[in-house]
């Protein structure tokens, strides 16, 4: 079973999620804690729940999502999983935006290209859409969703029907694409072709309803979960679900589909 505690951190009201399984193995998703007091909230949760941190998962590396990354990675000696495309964000987007608004740059690490390059000071491990991140009994499928940033990712736990969408998809909105590395058409395409179809995807190890006794308790429980829309934890704002966004999000209606020439 999945357990999720989410926090709202820093001046940009960024959502950070701590997710763990029944055995206490946990991951930090987008740790935007920007002060010692905010970081202490995460540490206190880990201690009070007796959690065992496994990794940090970044949907993208914009400064407001990684302010607490270095402190937590060092505290628990854990890797940081992100897309290699976020090197552009770290080297170009963050300095440009933080410089324009007088914001501090977050501490970071160099990204390694292979496990053999790993060291204490190089904690970035690149992941792609072919990868799965294991956090105890939880399995997070990595979904590449470029558009808000070059290396944007979402993380999908298929059995629990939970999606961490970062700044790709919000309740009633999408992430902005006017920063360096942004691409509106790529973002819309990512959501329409990779995220919304997750609502119709099968659960792992499930049989079709016709293969089960329709009157059995197992059949009714599995069917109910399968037809529950995927819950979405965005990087900002309220949580939502894919069914609601597919029907009501104004950015995802047919007239907004990318132009194909």
Predicted features, each with a name:
Residues 1-49, 154-166:
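Conserved beta-strand hairpin/beta-sheet module of binuclear metal-dependent hydrolase folds
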Residues 7-8, 122-124, 144-146:
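Short Gly/Pro-enriched turn/cap motifs at secondary-structure boundaries
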Residues 33-39, 43-134, 251, 255:
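Active-site HxH/HxHxD metal-binding segment of metal-dependent hydrolases
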Residues 19, 59, 145:
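Conserved S/T- and glycine-rich ATP-binding loop of Class I adenylate-forming
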Residues 5, 57, 141:
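Conserved Rossmann-like nucleotide-binding pocket used by diverse enzymes
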Residues 33-34, 97-100, 132, 138-258:
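Metallo-beta-lactamase
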């Amino acid at each position: 079973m999945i357990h999720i505690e989410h926090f709202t951190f820093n001046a940009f009201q960024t959502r950070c999620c701590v997710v763990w399984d029944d055995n206490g193995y946990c991951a930090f998703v987008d740790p935007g804690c920007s002060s010692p007091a905010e970081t202490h909230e995460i540490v206190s949760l880990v201690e009070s729940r007796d959690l065992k941190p496994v990794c940090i998962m970044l949907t993208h590396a914009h400064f407001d999502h990684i302010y607490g990354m270095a402190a937590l990675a060092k505290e628990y000696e854990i890797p940081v999983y992100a897309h290699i495309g976020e090197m552009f964000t770290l080297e170009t987007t963050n300095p440009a935006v933080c410089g324009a608004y007088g914001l501090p740059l977050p501490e970071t690490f160099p990204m390694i290209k292979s496990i053999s390059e790993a060291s204490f000071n190089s904690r970035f491990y690149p992941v792609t859409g072919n990868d799965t991140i294991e956090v105890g009994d939880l399995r997070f499928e990595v979904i590449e969703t470029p558009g808000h940033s070059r290396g944007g990712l979402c993380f999908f736990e298929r059995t629990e029907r939970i999606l961490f969408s970062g700044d790709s998809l919000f309740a009633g909105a999408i992430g902005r694409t006017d920063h360096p590395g942004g691409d509106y058409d790529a973002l819309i395409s990512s959501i329409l072709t990779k995220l919304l179809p997750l609502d119709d995807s099968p659960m792992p190890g499930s049989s079709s309803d016709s293969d089960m006794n329709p009157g059995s308790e197992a059949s009714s429980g599995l069917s109910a979960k399968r037809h529950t829309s995927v819950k979405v934890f965005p990087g900002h704002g309220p949580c939502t679900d894919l069914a609601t966004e597919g029907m009501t999000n104004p950015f995802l209606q047919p007239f907004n589909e990318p132009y194909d020439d």
